[in-house]
Design a protein with these regions (language model features):
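Recognition helices and adjacent regulatory flanks at domain boundaries
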Residues: 1-18, 52, 64, 85, ...
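Amphipathic alpha-helical dimerization/coiled-coil segments
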Residues: 2-7, 95-112
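N-terminal helix-turn-helix DNA-binding core of bacterial DNA-binding proteins
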Residues: 14-60, 87
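Basic, amphipathic "hinge/linker" alpha-helix immediately C-terminal to the N-terminal HTH DNA-binding motif
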Residues: 28, 80-103
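A general structural signal marking secondary-structure boundaries and capping sites
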Residues: 43, 72, 108-112
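Short amphipathic alpha-helical/adjacent loop interface patches that line ligand
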Residues: 43, 53, 65, 94, ...
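Canonical helix-turn-helix DNA-binding module
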Residues: 46-84
Length: 112
């Protein structure tokens, strides 16, 4: 709510910050939770993630991994091998999502 002299000027709905909206911006992609779920079990390579999530295309997986890395949920480590080896690991920020995923799993078991 914004006050201007004696006039009330309501904030536009799109300018009101919402923590849920911010969270969904970080982890709300179609494949994000599945990638995060697999990384809870430990560091994975691209090919491992693709095998564990067979419905995701390589392009979608690459996009999801880049997005999660940009948002600080996971980190990417490149090893100078031939061919190049790349591993993905959850950051502490990503690990904090464990409780949320667990609750979503319980909700789905109850209601779907």
């Amino acid at each position: 709510m914004v006050m201007n002299a004696n006039n009330y000027i309501p904030k536009e709905p799109e300018t009101i910050e919402c923590n849920i909206e911010k969270t969904l911006d970080v982890i709300g992609g179609k494949w994000a939770f599945l990638v995060i779920r697999e990384l809870f079990c430990g560091t994975k390579r691209f090919g491992e993630l693709q095998r564990l999530i067979p419905a995701v295309s390589p392009r979608a997986l690459t996009s999801t991994l880049r997005h999660l890395e940009e948002k600080g949920v996971l980190e990417r480590q490149v090893f100078p091998t031939v061919p190049v080896t790349v591993e993905y690991t959850l950051t502490p920020k990503g690990e904090d999502l464990h409780a949320i995923l667990k609750q979503m799993k319980l909700w789905a078991a109850k209601w779907t």
